[in-house]
C-alpha cells in the first residue's frame, strides 16, 4: 500500500467523522462556555464560543490571530478548505468574551495565534478533538460524538431553530455560509434529513 492509499483513508476518515459528529443544544453550549471560563480554561472556552457563534471550520479558527478578533465588530478570513473569502460579524456578547479571554490568557501580543499550547505551538486538530472528548466527560455533556465539527453544527442548528418560521430561507443562508453546493447537503450535514425520515414513522397510527 502506497502513500496514496494512506492519504485516501485519512480523507475518508475525516469525511466520515464530519458527517457523524453530533451537535450541542444551544443552552448547553452556552453553559459550557461559562463553565470552562469559570474553571479558568479560557482557551477552550474561547474555542467553543468562536465555533458556536461563527460556524467557522476548526482549521480556520486555529489560523486566527488576536489582532483579527480583539475589539473588532467583524473579521475576514480566507477559508483554508475552499479558498473563498468569508466575513464574520462578532456580536457584542462574543466581543466581550473575547476580551475577557484575552486578559486571562495574556498572549505575547496581538499578532499571536489565539490558540497556542503550553509548548508554544498552535493546537493541532487532533489534539483539539482529544480535548473536546475530555471536556465531554468532565462536564457530562448530553452529546454522542463531540468533536470539532460539533461546534460548527451547533451554530447551524441554532440558526435553523431560531428561524423555524422561514426554515427554507435559513437553510439557504446556512448553505452559503457553509459553502455547500446545495441545500440538501446542508440538511444532511445538520442531521435534518435523518430526522425527517425518522419522523415518517410518527405519522403512522392504529
Where are these regions (language model features)?
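Short, small-residue-biased leader/transition segments that mark boundaries at the very start
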Residues: 1-7
